Amino acid sequence: MRLFASKITVINAHRDTITKEMMYFSTVLKDCMIRKKVDTAPTNNTLNTVDYYSITIPYQDGYLSPYDYHRLPNDQMSGKWTLDTEEDLIILGEYTEPIDNDIYVKLLKRDDVGVIRSVSDNTTVPLLKHWRVIAK
């Protein structure tokens, strides 16, 4: 029985260990729960709305801690993913197109894309192992 029905795409930003260029790897994760929250934030004496996404990701294979993920050689990244608060993105839904620096910048402007801001690892509990991600 599935608890959640949404798909997300995690975009992991990784600096190539040889060329030092940015590389982007995408992983589609299924059976996630997405909740959207709209908040206000003061900016230059005005109130602006800010969208936050709270995403619950049930345990799925291939996850590595950000530290372990970034130590992997490029040829071992296939099938691996992480949740890093530095430059990683969450796309609501499935995204399978190739990503380069220009596409990454365009993705940042989309309403259905958020930068990972916090991660709560709940995979050591006996029931409902999951990660809770806040993206903005």
Where are these regions (language model features)?
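N-terminal intrinsically disordered, low-complexity, charge/repeat-rich segments that act as generic
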Residues: M1-M23, T27-V28, K37
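Short, conserved turn/kink motifs that form compact alpha/beta structural patches or helix kinks used as
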Residues: M22-K136
